Amino acid sequence: MAKPTKGKAPRRSRRNISAGRAYVHASYNNTIVTITDLDGNSVAWSSGGTIGYKGSKKGTPYAAQLAAADAVKKAQTSFGMAAVDVIVRGSGSGREQAIRAIQASGIEVRSIMDDSPVPHNGCRPKKKFRA
């Protein structure tokens, strides 16, 4: 005869994270916003695609704004995050709007840093990216 189940396992208590980092990866095709704790462990993320946009609409500033607001909302409700350092990578059209959305969402922005990868004259760019 089968043993009866013991019921649900106890829920883990909510980790309270007061500060973290918001990484904004802004490419020409999409904008991905990831919220991490100070150790770099991912807490919440969102992108133009997870908001519901497809194709070229994912790269728009409005999609970046919604993605940033969604990621911050997840981090605030799940972990009680109150302050972030914003780190921006890439030169897509959504980068400024994502920063503005993070600032407007009620979370304290302690610093903004641009960490865009810049080649030291590496590979030859494609035809459309050459000046």
UniProtKB/Swiss-Prot annotation:
<dbReference type="GO" id="GO:0022627">
    <property type="term" value="C:cytosolic small ribosomal subunit"/>
</dbReference>
<keyword id="KW-0689">Ribosomal protein</keyword>
<keyword id="KW-0699">rRNA-binding</keyword>
<dbReference type="GO" id="GO:0006412">
    <property type="term" value="P:translation"/>
</dbReference>
<comment type="subunit">
    <text>Part of the 30S ribosomal subunit. Interacts with proteins S7 and S18. Binds to IF-3.</text>
</comment>
<dbReference type="InterPro" id="IPR036967">
    <property type="entry name" value="Ribosomal_uS11_sf"/>
</dbReference>
<keyword id="KW-0694">RNA-binding</keyword>
<comment type="similarity">
    <text>Belongs to the universal ribosomal protein uS11 family.</text>
</comment>
<dbReference type="InterPro" id="IPR019981">
    <property type="entry name" value="Ribosomal_uS11_bac-type"/>
</dbReference>
<protein>
    <recommendedName>
        <fullName>Small ribosomal subunit protein uS11</fullName>
    </recommendedName>
</protein>
<comment type="function">
    <text>Located on the platform of the 30S subunit, it bridges several disparate RNA helices of the 16S rRNA. Forms part of the Shine-Dalgarno cleft in the 70S ribosome.</text>
</comment>
<dbReference type="Pfam" id="PF00411">
    <property type="entry name" value="Ribosomal_S11"/>
</dbReference>
<dbReference type="GO" id="GO:0003735">
    <property type="term" value="F:structural constituent of ribosome"/>
</dbReference>
<dbReference type="InterPro" id="IPR001971">
    <property type="entry name" value="Ribosomal_uS11"/>
</dbReference>
<dbReference type="InterPro" id="IPR018102">
    <property type="entry name" value="Ribosomal_uS11_CS"/>
</dbReference>
<dbReference type="GO" id="GO:0019843">
    <property type="term" value="F:rRNA binding"/>
</dbReference>
<keyword id="KW-0687">Ribonucleoprotein</keyword>
